[in-house]
Design a protein with these regions (language model features):
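N-terminal localization/anchoring segments of enzymes in phospholipid and broader phosphate metabolism
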Residues: 1-228
Length: 228
């Protein structure tokens, strides 16, 4: 029973078909990998080619900032969200009401009022014990477009382990955040649950953010069975 519910790593057939369609539709929008032409070292070139074959091209004109702790990324995340002019995409496994997420949500609500398009996606099981029932409806009431990924169904199902463990923020297509930290207070050590929590992360600026944008849209569109 436990294996059927949580051990099966394969997505439901319907969801897998939706993901496959979205991936094929997205492939033409992946930037051509011009970096390959610039690399002389055969070992490095081979690694870049391998990544490129899996639709993870290496980009020029990009910067990265490393965070050794979630609390280091937190303030930069708030600062960059507040600067958004066009759109914000956020996709997280766990969100929980508290200092971290409440600060994020306040900015998102303000950005909606300013005309910025805000899309938010959280995993229904990852946040199951953290949020009120149908929390996505609350976010939608603020004008935030929201998806609760793969709704939990309270009976034995072979597809309940199809979860979205990503932690991604994309701002205006040129600022991105990713890493191991979710949007909950334990990830910035405001709440001590299992001792001092350490998850790393990065802020990306420039062309490399394009792939994060595409990754978000693939999951978003597959969940809605739409194309954008």
């Amino acid at each position: 029973v436990l294996y059927l519910t949580f051990g099966n790593k394969k997505p439901a057939k319907k969801l897998q078909i939706a993901f496959d369609k979205q991936s094929k539709a997205t492939n033409p929008y992946i930037y051509p990998n011009h970096v390959l032409e610039e690399i002389a070292d055969p070992i490095i070139k081979g690694q870049i080619k391998y990544l490129d074959n899996e639709n993870f091209p290496v980009y020029n004109n990009s910067e990265i900032k490393y965070y050794s702790l979630g609390e280091e990324a937190y303030l930069d995340l708030l600062e960059e969200l507040a600067k958004a002019k066009h759109f914000i995409f956020m996709e997280y496994f766990i969100i929980e009401e508290g200092k971290m997420f409440d600060a994020v949500l306040n900015i998102l609500k303000q950005k909606v009022k300013e005309g910025v398009e805000v899309r938010f996606m959280y995993d229904d099981v990852g946040s199951l014990t953290m949020l009120p029932f149908k929390y996505y409806q609350k976010l939608e009431s603020y004008g935030i477009k929201c998806i609760s990924f793969n709704h939990f169904v309270p009976f034995i199902s072979a597809v309940m382990n199809t979860r979205d463990h990503r932690k991604i923020t994309v701002i205006d297509g040129n600022i991105g955040f990713s890493g191991g930290f979710n949007l909950a207070d334990e990830y910035i050590n405001e709440k001590v649950k299992y001792g001092h929590w350490k998850d790393t992360g990065v802020m990306i600026k420039g062309e490399a953010v394009w792939n994060l944008t595409l990754m978000f849209l693939v999951t978003w569109n597959a969940s809605l069975n739409s194309f954008e």
